[in-house]
């Protein structure tokens, strides 16, 4: 550990007992590998293999026109460099993509009108631009329109053939109806199924079913062939009055005789009636020499004839294949002298008559009728002809354009049906269909097993590359139609490939996929862990997948094959449970899309270090031991019986039968679950909540790695890209808050610059508005190796994930303030900013060109006081660093308001005399309610050709200065390195020539060289040719590097000065970023890592909190009743171990202080070696040891890996070493009375997270605001600045109190009575406090809805009704 840079700063004590052999793969490999394989940007030697983008082009091209006189071929594709880099795309709100250029070849043929022979007339090649292809960033994300998105991998049913039954649900008798389904990667599905009468049917694409024999007829078989394919035949030969039937021991074993079995030759009884023929007896009968048995006419009746019985002379058909033999038929056959009758071997026990019965009910008996039937099912209403029917049937399953099993489908099919087709055979064959029907019939006969569709051998993962490939193929196919039409309509001799191609459909398909596909998601960027988990997510939803509503329990359930592949713990709560999963830590996806997990080989009971990755199908054959199986020093399995897994069962076997062993105990859980210490002591439901809530932890102002971790923290920080790792080994040259400059020392490849500049992100906004800020960990002069962490990012500390803070917890009730999971906090936590986080809100405003004239961003706003403009600069944009509150102006903007459009003359007069104020309204960007903060960044975007204002120019100048500084620093290091190398070459030489004033043959020393300016050193010439070429090469390389540097700088400046690409109609856009500091307050949600969540109920003054004997106050008080029923005891063990860690930290701190006083490192070394193993400390100098010790003052960090961590005894040992009570409990004193509590209390350090559910984002108030247009009721929700709904139950409450007038107000003038609202306003203005409520608008809406149902409802007010009564004529009144 001590050999890494961070390891020299802080060491984690490791409790794991099991050595891990396999290297954990990079956590975002799933994304990166998949997309790289799809794009294949760098063309390998010998051209690209046929996969990814290459295969898409290969499958669509060549395209020929309808008359086949021209052919458009695909040659190759290349990517150009992307126009903007990742950061520029993020800032400008555009997509990070590279232009795709495709080389196409157009071949025009001459067709001889007489012979039809073709000859090449013309060949044209050209590069065609085919739109931009989004590129993946280093961290496995895509930048689409300036936001980071992730493409989630999809789990779907693997192509291939599946056998299943309906579990007895279809038929009332509960009979199992078997079915087979052939699922291609794309194309028509074919189902073959039994019905309740045991007839076999086929259906194509879930359409109407047809007898399976019709399908077989369509494949070109006839009835006799069908029967001979599915059944064996037995020939009965006439033997006097009886028949002889050949004796077959295999066929008859297990047969129960109803009559005596008699040997046809000798006449002896070989088996008496009522007895069962065992396998042994059957064998003995054959050994005795029995060749045939005797059979009577009765035995033949009821059997089925195996082939057509025909009189070849007359052509008369006596019986057809499949006919049942009746006594009459048998007599008829005997009469015409037939001596041998071949029958089908159907015994109704081992072999059923299903296919024969299907053949009997099938109306068709030849190919033509069957094809017509299939055509009518697929295209009802169209009259079939033989040609169209044949073509349609061929295109369904045998046309590679329409039907693709994919390599996976073919491999799975071969495995399931024991076929041997090559995996390039992607369509179905006749043999495949026959094999499927045969396997289905065997299932019905009780042979074989049905498939488990939730087995991971039958589900595969489609990652980014493959999803993108399918999408692009769709785009190209749309394009293909257009190309064909264009080829036919233009003069083909004169056009170039460019003219035939419109790349819009392809580009649109890509855009649509990244912009609106269900699997393209807005990246969860709350903290580094949530980024990593989002990229490792597997979703069963999405196009071609399941839907939430239809997914049953089985699909969602944990399956034995998930072990080491999919995490059984991490999945969302709610409707998506089990449909969205997470990849396990060591899992990877193989080329076929199946998830593999690593194992160690075990040979003869000895565990080796050889690691193999196996998919679920391959694993089923082996006995797999657990990683925790006991071994001796020679790695021999020591127990007599080892617990193993095999094919989903857990069994015990002898050590020498074990084949494999898990590589690590944490290989079965996901990254988030592997971050929970003592996971093995938590209930699974709570662990699920714990994994999910860690992803919602907000990065705090001061990160603090957990005292009790699991050792995964560093891995997550590194792979998430939050912490910066050194790209090459080198020496730190410069460090400040915004960048780190490293002078590279490893292989200085002449083409690469000898310096790496790492820009640190400062106060950037994440997708979730949390704050991304990085800070350096290194000092000038430190040596770093490749991969060392040189800067911390959000939620990382010393290169380890740090999602929360270690706080001193006491488990005890406190005045009911921690009832029902509430959390009581000490004021110290607020005062010391323990749980303070920074959130960055982004506000943007656009100045558009309206019909009435352009909007303008300005400081000159009508009717606004100077006070309100105090934070704006002369361009009308807020200053950086200004503190703003709700309602403050961020960007001043005025919009022309038109009574009427102006004539050109009026426009001219306006322009000359500038009468503005009268006809503009204030549409400034203001701070929304509930936001208070500091402006941290302002970005101004101008359209091409629009003059930049002062603010935009100032921002541009700053940016150019920064770029120039980078260039100058890189140049300085380049100079220093190059001239140092040149000096090394020249010193000790006696040049024959040199700069002006140099005497020939003078011996060069460093002093002599120092007399000449460095730029003149190149003029020295030495005799040695080899040395001269070296100097020349050095100079050439130096000049090129210099030129490259300057060019890069100029490119960036040119990009800055160029206008921005804004949406149509927008002249100018300003983005303002406000940083909001959120301290913790009552109502915020907090959680530990064990699913122990709660809401802060009260923040208590420090002096009132319970305190320990040494006067230390607890930071947080949790309710002990939250533990037993939830069964997440991990939090208690974590508290104890954290308590020990803090105690050891105090001891180390004392030793460090003693060392600093008297410079004797021995006591410090002894203290440290009590805690750590010697190997962890070797190679540390005294000064480094003191630095490590200094970083342990607050507590010694420990790692207790999941299923392999500290046991109770280890915790007690640590507590003892720290000089604390072994029980982990302490006497606490009441902060208010100073008296000790009656019983000891569990006190220790627990790691708490502040979650993204902050009360500030939820609290909301409104007096007057927007109303809905239709119902005129106030809108709802904080985002719309809506009101609170006064619902049914609230109405009951007011009714119960009899508060009639309050209720009337609520339902009318405070809600949707439009006239009443204005009256109230007028009354308030007049100072009057009486008003009248009218009819609520929603009542009118209800009336309109009733009218739309055809009920004519009229409203008659009660006064009017009374008047009508009075005015009624007297006779009507009578």
UniProtKB/Swiss-Prot annotation:
It comes from the Bacteria. Its EC number is 2.7.7.6. Gene3D superfamilies: 2.40.50.100, 2.40.50.150, 3.90.1100.10, DNA-directed RNA polymerase, beta subunit, external 1 domain, DNA-directed RNA polymerase, subunit 2, domain 6, RNA polymerase alpha subunit dimerisation domain, RNA polymerase Rpb2, domain 2. One of its GO terms (molecular function) is ribonucleoside binding. Keywords: DNA-directed RNA polymerase, Nucleotidyltransferase, Transcription, Transferase. GO terms for biological process: DNA-templated transcription. One of its GO terms (cellular component) is DNA-directed RNA polymerase complex. The keyword Phosphoprotein does not apply. PROSITE patterns: RNA_POL_BETA. It is an enzyme of class 2 (transferase). DNA-dependent RNA polymerase catalyzes the transcription of DNA into RNA using the four ribonucleoside triphosphates as substrates. Belongs to the RNA polymerase beta chain family. HAMAP family: RNApol_bact_RpoB. PANTHER family: DNA-DIRECTED RNA POLYMERASE I SUBUNIT 2. The RNAP catalytic core consists of 2 alpha, 1 beta, 1 beta' and 1 omega subunit. When a sigma factor is associated with the core the holoenzyme is formed, which can initiate transcription. NCBIfam families: PRK00405.1, rpoB. This is DNA-directed RNA polymerase subunit beta. It comes from Methylobacterium sp. (strain 4-46). The lineage of its organism: Bacteria, Pseudomonadati, Pseudomonadota, Alphaproteobacteria, Hyphomicrobiales. The gene is rpoB.
